[in-house]
Amino acid sequence: MNKNDLRVIKTKKGIHEALLRLLNKKPLTQIKVTELCKEATINRGTFYFHYEEVGDVFSEFFEEIIQDLKASYDEPYKVLGKDNFSVHRLDPNMVRIFHHIKKYEGFYKIVFSNNVSSNYYYMLFDEIRANLTSDENNHHQIITNNFFYSYQANAIIGMIIEWYRNGFQESAEEMNVYLMEIVKFKV
């Protein structure tokens, strides 16, 4: 079966959604294949046709989210071009990170809840930091780059956490404006 087959896409989406529901109740390590199959309303044969274990489902779903996050981060560069990029030329409408968060809100609610391991947080931190590190336009003359990238990644995550604590009440567009105001703020 082709991975672009609509049946495969729908089945995997259902499994991903079932995994999210279960992750709201317990850690990944405690979720069994049988339990996931029941939640996704599929049989074990269908599960094993696509995956070997529950961790594979999480890895695939996390990779999908990270690819979308990377695409969201890169969006302003597509509009302005890597050579012409400047924070001062950046319009809040070009920022897509918060649209990404809204799209995967269920996942981020789990990542930032107090009920789960901080491993998810650090996985997300590492991915955001990797995006910042690979950005040729993102460097600081005085501060060691590792500290600079970690500061920026935590600043973005801090905004996302605050948004989460507010129940994602603000729109992605509002969050974009807040981010741009913070980025352009000079002490």
Regions found by a protein language model. Name each.
Residues 74-103:
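Hydrophobic alpha-helical connector segments
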Residues 114-139, 143-150:
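Amphipathic alpha-helical packing segments from all-alpha helical-bundle domains
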Residues 135-182:
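Hydrophobic/aromatic-rich alpha-helical bundle segments in the mid-to-C-terminal region
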